[in-house]
């Protein structure tokens, strides 16, 4: 694969020039709710640019996995219809954090263009900002001035946000030749097909104030990004990014599965392109811990998958197919991203389940669309509200709604539809940035000399100083008795909630007062904030205090965290290597672990997992921790790491017997400290994600005692020895089964007895025999039984039965034979006709349906309505 070679050579080039190769962060930022997905190489370095985070290196290079399918950068609707738009792509980049600047960045870019990309220097062009004389002069060392163009802020000025770091940028373009257009310069190439941009160099040298003025940054940074797929296309000489390398391989696989051939210029070409791109986005998102859902990132992922299915239908796919393309992706990219190989079954399972659900939803949506068409017959227009519901709730594409509407000479109220869609997108955007705005402001404004130093791995108490006090979102100088607030300390033994471990509680005190810490969090890297209330006296900023963690609670939390690690390893050993942690929570009372697994765990496997964890507890292994360079452990098969997580260059390895994980949490000293481990329950939390809840120590002992007590009480109730309880229960169930059958037989005899009395009420219209009858109130729970018996006894082809409940409401049931359904008669349509005039409700399937109403017309009116409906349907 050319992409593998190009990626490797690019990273090696910069590594040989003192750049640290930094692994790609996940496709969604864990600690930045302001953006839906990682959409550029600089995202994972954002806090470095903002001086919120420090790292040991000043130069970095990456190949970053990116998704642009939501928020400000959203290419979803363009994918498949242009030559280069993608939702998933890789961005090659090099970064300088206060190290080199324009001169070196431009020199590197030129050298890479010639020696790594092997571009003809006579076909390279550059753009700079109209005010950036320095960059223009530097490019003149490599290019003639007539191939360097000055552009405005619109094209050559970059900013992270409305305020903050920003600067001029310089773009590199490659002339693909006259076959891609007649333009003679980038300025004439409005479509950008001949002179294709392949690299953007951003020079962060300013800080934009709230007033809009540009101030010089004390440290100047470089951020560059080059799209790997675009580079591969240029080097391969293909017309589009889809005709080379990985994407072409995925298109070929789709050709094999569909039996159709890919032709770029034909209408079906878009379907191939959409599927190839979307399979990559879905696969990497699932690997990094995302699953399709109804909100935020999960909702976007669901849209991507459903869009794939919609285009797949054009190629003839009528059942799940995306999972069959995944192995081709793994073959192409598994070497560069080994997490793909480890998660193949998980990716395929999530895709297949989601596709199955969507195909069912499409079927329901199609039926609903038919109802909408009937209910809208007076206006010949499908309302924007109905169209939006069909798309948003049932996933029916707008173009499919419009096509079906056209078949019936209907139109769609597109203005209202697009307005509702716009409002939905705006709500989604506000939800994404809401938590970001609410949590960052006050902490970003603090001027602290140093971040809080955590000493709590070994010390649960320390003498320290109060560095800041926050009350009601504002920094204050003191807190009085009974006032709630937040303390920030210079050193702290309190562990802040993160990595699934709950924060510590305890006390912060001095001779002047005591602050009860209820919980501890970390709003940004390096900062620990203590939430609580002054119980007596008062506390001031800069005051010397003693910080004391609640020791027993910490011990129980630490034991449970170690238990979580043991459980994770036991799951992997029992169920397989596909097990990956998808989330966790540990406090002083319980363990909750979410993990990837396609189905419920068998009881015998749960028992094996529990036994294995308890075996490691009895072996009483020392729990050991050590720090290591991430580069030394990142490829270790023994040490568990989570592909959705971002790691610093120095990591902490926690080893507990057979378990080895990268973890920053607190742990037991020995596995034996856990005492005993019990699983409470196992259940699904999302498609392909299971959850186990468990307890250790005292909580596990309490559970065991309760189980023992329950068994004794059950034995007493059953009047059976404990070792005979199961046999006794089985005998009771067998007896109940026999009694139920006897009751059912008697009920059927009663039903047939009643039917013998009313059999002469069966009526006929043409060749359709039908039966409509009012049953006594006592028979309301057996409407369906009566209808089925009528079909068997006469057999009658259409039945409608109704009765009155004790609350005065009417219940009506209709059943239609299979052969009538094939002729177009549907039970739910009949109930719609019978119940609409009286404001009733109904639901069901084509063969049988049930409804209710507060009132019904007289029997003869119902009979006439039914006759008219049958006659109309048979025309």
From Swiss-Prot:
Zn(2+) binds at residues 561, 565, 663, 667. GO terms for molecular function: alanine-tRNA ligase activity; aminoacyl-tRNA deacylase activity; ATP binding; tRNA binding; zinc ion binding. One of its GO terms (biological process) is alanyl-tRNA aminoacylation. It catalyses: tRNA(Ala) + L-alanine + ATP = L-alanyl-tRNA(Ala) + AMP + diphosphate. GO terms for cellular component: cytosol. SUPFAM superfamilies: Class II aaRS and biotin synthetases (SSF55681), Putative anticodon-binding domain of alanyl-tRNA synthetase (AlaRS) (SSF101353), ThrRS/AlaRS common domain (SSF55186), Translation proteins (SSF50447). It comes from the Bacteria. This is Alanine--tRNA ligase.
